[in-house]
Curated annotation (Swiss-Prot):
Family under the similarity heading: Belongs to the class-I aminoacyl-tRNA synthetase family. Glutamate--tRNA ligase type 1 subfamily.
Gene designation per UniProt: gltX
InterPro entries: aa-tRNA-synth_I_cd-bd, aa-tRNA-synth_I_codon-bd_sub2, aa-tRNA-synth_I_CS, aa_tRNA-synth_I_cd-bd_sf, Glu-tRNA-ligase_bac/mito, Glu/Gln-tRNA-synth, Glu/Gln-tRNA-synth_Ib_cat-dom, GluQ/Sye
Record organism: Porphyromonas gingivalis (strain ATCC BAA-308 / W83)
Binding residue positions for ATP: K263
Name of the protein this chain belongs to: Glutamate--tRNA ligase
Function: Catalyzes the attachment of glutamate to tRNA(Glu) in a two-step reaction: glutamate is first activated by ATP to form Glu-AMP and then transferred to the acceptor end of tRNA(Glu).
GO cellular component annotations of the record: cytosol
PANTHER family: GLUTAMATE--TRNA LIGASE, GLUTAMATE--TRNA LIGASE, MITOCHONDRIAL-RELATED
């Protein structure tokens, strides 16, 4: 392995929204690149035109930007190895298809889909390989003149890689160690289709990684069975000395651990599997995302980083900078990681507690607007400081703090029965008079005054406080009652108490 600059790529296909497993792959690439002072490339692998979904590429870019996963070059970023969309690299791929054909490492096949289907029906476990290619319609069995004629006439064909049998192909994986597979189990994979003049994933992947000087390929374990083919392609091109190192990440599993995590699991258990909300352009169906569900991007990043890797200590909460410093690709687990969505909620709660109140106020502002509330930044930040320990998601801020901005229109019946006693109206009337004449409304000023008044009059502290909370909030929730009064101010506090007396009697 020659010593060279670390360069990694995240290469999604625009076939739909980016799955949370793909986000983790992008994150691990990013952590590895940043740790080694290397480059992160965004490449869009859009060679499968049949599966292309409008809007998917823009979604992928927006999702990664939201999560703070940044690229040095690629689609939307530019760079000297472009273009970075595979559909824009046709001329490049044609050159390398021709190189393989000329060197005898690939061949042209004219078998139609119907003919191949017939063979599969005749022969169980049929595959196009060294044992069967001599029986098929291809440039290995047809005269050269006929091959030229068929191509000239526009007959559709594919180019297949000629896999030599009985070779031990070694893949040195950074996570799984040495993996050896005999080439006899591999089929002659299709590398190019004349129908759309585009390569398949395998050829485009190898050519692009080589030309873009990718040093490490970090991807999901679903690509591990393809790794021997990719090694053989590097050999066929004479690029084995500059072949990247591979690291195949274990799958994200269902919370129960039995199988790969899917959208269906999220729907069943009530958690997102996409970073952002996604609207299917064909059906109009909407799938919720982590952003719209009230998750902070830092929490999602921290949560995902620890699904399949840990720093070797008891530390859970880590910033992106800490993750970059501690991440070790070789310590990633070979076994799949159960998706613990409750742990994700826990991480979000931790990050909400740590986040600056002014920043949370910015995130809360759209929710205030939806509820017709206009409030100062100072008040909003103050309110958040009082309630954020009670919330797991941004959306829950309104549930916990809405009463600070809109007076209760009704009162919880159970709380009324429990807290509103015969003498409550009289006592709260006196409290309203006391508060209305109080000069300072800071909590540290009102609390001793009110408690002294309660003691002097022989009233029950708990009864007064509970009834006052009901008057101000409409139910029995909320932070310290004197903090609530301070935020509401004298006029609003007294007004709410007097309205409760009027309504509840």
């Amino acid at each position: 392995m020659i010593n060279r600059r670390i360069r990694v790529r995240f290469a999604p296909s625009p076939t739909g929204p980016l799955h949370i497993g793909g986000v983790r792959t992008a994150l691990y690439n990013y952590l590895f690149a940043r740790q080694h002072g290397g480059d992160m490339i965004l490449r869009i692998e859009d060679t499968d035109s049949n599966r292309f979904v409008p809007g998917a590429e823009a979604y992928i870019i927006e999702a990664l930007e939201w999560l703070g996963i940044k690229f040095d070059e690629g689609v939307g970023y530019g760079g000297r190895f472009g273009p970075y969309r595979q559909s824009e690299r046709r001329d490049i791929y044609r050159t390398y298809v021709r190189q393989l054909l000329d060197s005898g490492r690939a061949y042209i096949a004219f078998d139609t889909p119907e003919e191949l289907e017939a063979r599969r029906a005749e022969v169980p476990n049929f595959q196009y390989d060294a044992t069967t290619r001599g029986q098929m319609r291809n440039s290995l069995t047809l005269p050269a003149e006929e091959v030229e004629r068929l191509v000239a006439e526009g007959t559709q064909y594919v180019v297949r890689f000629l896999v030599e049998p009985n070779l031990d192909v070694e893949v040195n994986d950074l996570i799984r160690g040495r993996v050896v597979i005999n080439s006899s189990i591999l089929d002659d994979k299709v590398l190019y289709k004349s129908a759309d003049d585009l390569p398949t994933y395998h050829l485009a992947n190898i050519v692009d990684d080589h030309l873009m000087e990718v040093s490490h390929v970090i991807r999901g374990e679903e690509w591990l069975p393809s790794a021997p083919l990719h090694v053989l392609l590097y050999r066929a091109f004479g690029w084995e000395d500059t072949m990247p190192r591979f690291a195949h990440l274990a799958l994200l599993l269902k919370p129960e651990g039995n199988g790969k995590l899917s959208k269906r699991d999220g729907d069943r258990l009530g958690f997102p599997v996409f970073p952002l909300e996604w609207k299917d352009p064909q059906t109009g169906d909407i799938s919720k995302g982590y952003r719209e569900s009230g998750y902070l991007p830092e929490a999602v990043v921290n949560f995902l980083a620890l699904l399949g890797w840990n720093p070797g200590n008891d530390q859970d909460v880590m910033s992106m900078d800490e993750l970059i410093r501690l991440f070790d690709i070789e310590k990633c687990s070979k076994a799949g990681a159960k998706f613990d969505y409750e742990k994700g909620r826990w991480f979000n709660h931790q990050y909400i507690q740590r986040k600056d109140n002014a920043e949370l106020a910015e995130l809360f502002r759209p929710i205030l607007r939806e509820n017709g509330v206009v409030a100062t930044d100072e008040k909003t930040a103050h309110v958040i400081s009082l309630v954020k320990e009670r919330v797991n998601f941004i959306g829950e801020l309104w549930e916990q703090a809405g009463f600070f901005f809109i007076a209760p229109l009704s009162y919880d019946e159970k709380t009324v029965k429990k807290r509103w006693k015969e003498d409550t109206a009289k006592q709260l009337g006196e409290l309203a008079e006391l508060l209305d004449s109080h000069r300072s409304f800071a909590a540290e000023a009102t609390e001793p005054t009110v408690k002294n008044w309660i003691e002097t009059n022989g009233y029950h502290l708990g009864n007064i406080m509970n009834a006052t909370r009901l008057a101000l909030v409409g139910e029995s929730k909320g932070p310290h009652i004197f903090d609530i009064m301070e935020v509401l101010g004298r006029e609003e506090t007294v007004g709410r108490i007097r309205r409760a007396i009027e309504v509840l009697g």
